[in-house]
Amino acid sequence: MERPTPRVTKDMLPECSGKTVRIVGKANQVEGETAKVDSNGSFDMHLTVDNTLEPNHFYEFVVSVKPDSSVQLLTCVDFGTDIDMEVYQKLVLFSHKYNSLFFE
């Protein structure tokens, strides 16, 4: 069975060192192998040559959080240009409050 990939926001990333997580965010800027992403706060994400992101699109990113809290993109799904991030924030909080429903 695969390990669960909990949903998080930017402010939760330091707690996720060494883990694979999901994070919904907006790709604000993409330059080379780095993207600036906003998900309840801005952070830089390392890309590979296989990753192409459209600026101003929302994505669900599956990322690896490194021990230094840097973020490496593993895969993503384009969610388009209109996501209610307030609802996503509530989903994240709900999923952590009732983690047995989502992670076990």
From Swiss-Prot:
It is found in: Nucleus. Keywords: DNA replication, Nucleus. InterPro entries: NA-bd_OB-fold, Rfa2. The keyword Nucleus applies. GO terms for biological process: base-excision repair; DNA replication; DNA replication, synthesis of primer; double-strand break repair via homologous recombination; mismatch repair; nuclear DNA replication; nucleotide-excision repair; telomere maintenance. One of its GO terms (molecular function) is damaged DNA binding. Disulfide bonds: none annotated. GO terms for cellular component: chromosome, telomeric repeat region; cytosol; DNA replication factor A complex; nucleus; site of double-strand break. The keyword Nucleus applies. It holds the Pfam family Rep_fac-A_3. It comes from the Eukaryota. As part of the replication protein A (RPA/RP-A), a single-stranded DNA-binding heterotrimeric complex, may play an essential role in DNA replication, recombination and repair. Binds and stabilizes single-stranded DNA intermediates, preventing complementary DNA reannealing and recruiting different proteins involved in DNA metabolism. PANTHER family: REPLICATION PROTEIN A 14 KDA SUBUNIT, REPLICATION PROTEIN A3. Belongs to the replication factor A protein 3 family. Component of the heterotrimeric canonical replication protein A complex (RPA). This is Replication factor A protein 3. It comes from Schizosaccharomyces pombe (strain 972 / ATCC 24843). The gene is ssb3.
